Amino acid sequence: MICDPSVQQYSGYIDVSPEKHLFYWFFESRNAKPTSPLVVWLNGGPGCSSFSGLLGGVGPCRINDSGRGTLPNIHSWNSNAHVLFLDQPTNVGFSYGASVNSTIEAAIDTATFLRKFYDQFPQYSRCALHVMGESYAAHYVPAIAAQIVKDNKRNGKARSLPLASIAVGNGLFDMATQFMYLPEMACNSTYKSVANSEACMLMEKAGSDFAKSLEIARSSPSQETMVNATYAGYDILIPYQKAGGSPYDVRKTCTGGSLCDPYLNRISIYANQPWIRTDLGVRVDKEFVLCSTSVQDSFIYAGDEMIDSSQWLPMILAAGVRVLNYAGDADLICNWMGNKALMLGVQWPGNEQFAAAPDRQWVVDGQALGEIRSFGNMSFMRVYGAGHMVALDQPAASLAMVTQWLDHGAILAQSALS
């Protein structure tokens, strides 16, 4: 077995319909117990394979310098949980089939996938289910959880999926709220960025133009106005990128490659090796692309990027499902400022108490690794010293965070953990 030969693995396809075939790669926990939880991991894009997470800190191995092999990841999330990496929607990574261009359709397909996975592997049916992801997965994860909640009510206890929590890292829930914080993060964060005064001025102007586009989209909603607003949002980043900055880490310049990180380019080299395809049971004619621009474009042109996925959080919380939003505090595009503002704006019965809750230092083994704010089933976490991909930049903190969340949940609200 590849990547982590010490654990049981499964990989292949589950057909969510005759026309849709979703690829997955599953790793049992290194400390497998009957009570081990099951984490389903999704990357975003839209259009990016979950190999980004699997080989980018969340999974049990990382790519070596040549891109042809792997190295063990001692901070893998499967240290204490089963982890399933899913390429979704169709035509992302190794998945293929009829095209999908909306979060809602993708959520329906993923909920169907999970039911079929449990049917195929009933030994995991009692494992608490945690749906997690990063970036544009902030669209997918709440929608999937909401779909599961609805399906569970309809199907009854015997066919219910054991959804316990959701978690999203540096997510894009609502562009309208979060992108307003791009100039602030680029120009006034605790980190020194490449943005000079001219770039900051241009970002502020682009932010004003974005606000105007949002007003037009709200007053005259159509595919055209939604798409125009989406592009106006991304225009805020242009001055920063022209100055050479990475939208995924304000501490860095963009050095090329996916997410301005050459490491991620090696994932495609690894995944396209014939022996990898054979071992994983992948179609030999399916070329692996880490992030599909055609899938991303189809979501943009359908207006999907303007959806506010936080609309599903009150329903999820009401069902007793815990919600964690965590953010590396050096990311720009889905920065912690915008994510915190997003969470403070969620309308649920605990809104006032969550807003009044203190931000407490999160300390592990005597080291401050971030800040945590919690009330009830909702938590927001700022992770120090991490960019867009927390597990890649701060692997030890990432593992400590997810282990505490899975084992205890509310412990994250304490001011000191060791």
Residue ranges and their predicted role:
Residues 1-418:
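Terminal and linker regions of secretory-pathway proteins
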